């Protein structure tokens, strides 16, 4: 069935890396709502910076936390309003009104399914199944004007940008086949040290030492000694198992135990980069 409205979901911690460069071309001519999910994991200053940047591009952003339900009602109302606008245009062309069909799109693991579940829980009435190409697709009526497809569309992440690939890995937004936890954790520790000097990132000075009671030293050649830090942290916390410590560090970030951290800020704001290499996946 033809889709009229696309609800694009991105990860609020990495809004650029979870935006697909070809999406605007794919959805040309359709209404578009941009959602930044996991707002609770990003500092308010970073949210304000991103909102201002998107506003300057003529794009309204809907900040949500699908897990807690924050911002979901406002998103639902915005989608229903978009449906009403589209039907007003149809009426102006002498066409009969019909429920507008909306599809939710986004990279893997950015929270599309959780968001759909939140929206569906607030549904007004459930509509009938309509045959899809390969399986039955269920449409859920969210208002008099709007039907939402209850299966999310998945955009393929592109790993040709190594810094974006690292951020996707850190946020658990790409498959683990593309990276190893130890390498990702070492890059993350290095990135955290660099982010200490970036306003609005949410990274406090000495974050790793404060959290794990292990100081992050400097290499003689310059730069943080992340391998030495990981080995010492493993001795203290995981019985000397570096891989388990690496996994713990990544999990602590992904579960917000390190606090709210923005890994990306709007274009024009200098952000640090670290040397990484990821496998390229076909898109």
Which role fits each region the language model picked out?
Residues 86-90, 117, 123-129, 198-200:
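Short, structured loop/turn "capping" segments at alpha-beta junctions
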Residues 95-97, 118-119, 140-141:
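Solvent-exposed alpha-helices and their adjacent loops that cap or buttress functional pockets
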Residues 33, 39-106, 124:
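Canonical P-loop GTPase G-domain recognition
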Residues 27-28, 55, 120:
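Short conserved AdoMet
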Residues 101-121, 125, 151:
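Glycine-rich phosphate-binding P-loop
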Residues 70-72, 107, 112, 133, ...:
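Gly/Ser/Thr-rich helix-start
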Residues 1-6, 13-33, 39, 45, ...:
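Helix-rich effector regions associated with P-loop NTPase G domains
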Residues 74, 78, 114, 187-190, ...:
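Alpha-helical scaffold segments in soluble metabolic enzymes
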């Amino acid at each position: 069935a033809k889709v009229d409205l696309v609800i694009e979901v991105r990860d609020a911690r990495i809004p650029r890396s979870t935006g697909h460069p070809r999406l605007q071309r794919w959805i040309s001519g359709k209404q578009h709502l941009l959602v930044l999910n996991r707002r609770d994991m990003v500092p308010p200053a970073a949210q304000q910076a991103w909102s201002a940047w998107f506003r300057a591009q003529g794009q309204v952003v809907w900040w949500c936390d699908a897990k807690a339900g924050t911002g979901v009602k406002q998103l639902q109302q915005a989608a229903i309003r978009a449906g009403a606008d589209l039907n007003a245009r149809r009426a102006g062309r002498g066409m009969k009104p019909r429920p507008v069909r909306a599809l939710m799109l986004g990279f893997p693991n950015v929270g599309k399914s959780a968001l759909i579940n939140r929206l569906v829980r607030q549904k007004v009435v459930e509509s009938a199944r309509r045959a899809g190409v390969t399986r039955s697709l269920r449409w859920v009526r969210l208002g008099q004007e709007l039907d939402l497809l209850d299966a999310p569309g998945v955009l393929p992440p592109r790993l040709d940008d190594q810094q974006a690939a690292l951020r996707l890995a850190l946020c658990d937004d790409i498959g683990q086949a593309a990276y190893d936890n130890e390498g990702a954790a070492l890059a993350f520790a290095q990135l955290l040290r660099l982010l200490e000097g970036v306003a609005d990132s949410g990274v406090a000075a000495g974050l790793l030492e404060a959290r794990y009671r292990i100081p992050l030293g400097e290499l003689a050649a310059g730069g943080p000694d992340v391998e030495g830090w990981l080995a010492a942290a493993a001795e203290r916390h995981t019985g000397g198992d570096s891989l388990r410590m690496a996994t713990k560090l990544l999990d602590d970030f992904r579960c917000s135990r390190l606090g709210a951290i923005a890994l990306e800020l709007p274009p024009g704001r200098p952000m640090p980069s670290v040397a990484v290499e990821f496998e390229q996946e076909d898109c």
